[in-house]
């Protein structure tokens, strides 16, 4: 079986029960490739309440894609538990790697582990999106006058004995790390209602 697929459609989804909730896990299955299971912080959001349906989560799908389904990322309030631990909101996210639920409450950025082995030389990242900023921007649990922006990026790095995976701190470090080989970061993050 080859490496992971290089075309992603967000058409394959399974529902996962956790903490009296159900959320979506997306995966890519293409003939001749290993199945790629996407990761998100949905498992962490599931700790904030019960009775959530998959579409209540920050990371879900919508049937209103350019063709077929699309990924839907929404920032959600985390309720009293999230406020208690200093994490009053949860942003929708999707990444290749894993989410360490054991670290989620104490260090959310470390809980996000990016990466999988990729055997090709990357040339470009192409995709489609729609984006609308939420009506309020929260910082430290308080509404501010700032406006939200989104981010899309692909990071390629060399795995070594000391660095097996990069984590969520990479964004705070301006997407720079000594093991980085290449990065593609979207620069035009304007709101648009068209694909």
Descriptions of predicted regions:
Residues 2-124, 147-157, 164-195:
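Aromatic (Trp/Tyr/Phe) and Gly/Pro-enriched flexible surface segments
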Residues 121-133:
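A short beta-strand element within beta-rich, extracytoplasmic domains
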Residues 131-147, 160-163:
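Extended, low-complexity, turn-rich repeat/linker tracts enriched in Gly/Pro/Ser/Thr and Asp/Glu
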């Amino acid at each position: 079986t080859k490496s992971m697929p290089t075309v992603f459609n967000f058409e394959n989804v399974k529902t996962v029960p956790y903490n009296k909730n159900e959320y979506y896990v997306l995966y890519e299955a293409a003939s001749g490739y290993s199945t790629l299971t996407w990761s998100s912080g949905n498992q962490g959001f599931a700790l904030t309440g019960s009775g959530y349906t998959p579409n209540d989560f920050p990371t879900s799908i919508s049937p209103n894609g350019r063709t077929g389904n699309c990924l839907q990322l929404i920032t959600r309030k985390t309720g009293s538990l999230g406020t208690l631990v200093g994490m009053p909101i949860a942003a929708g996210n999707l990444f290749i790697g894993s989410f360490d639920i054991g670290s989620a409450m104490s260090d959310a950025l470390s809980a996000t582990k990016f990466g999988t082995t990729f055997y090709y030389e990357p040339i470009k990242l192409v995709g489609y999106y729609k984006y609308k900023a939420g009506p309020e921007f929260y910082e430290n649990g308080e509404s501010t006058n700032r406006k939200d922006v989104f981010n899309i990026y692909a990071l390629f790095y060399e795995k070594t004995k000391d660095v097996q995976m990069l984590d969520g701190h990479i964004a705070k470090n301006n997407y720079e790390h000594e093991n980085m080989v290449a990065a593609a970061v979207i620069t035009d993050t304007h709101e648009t209602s068209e694909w």
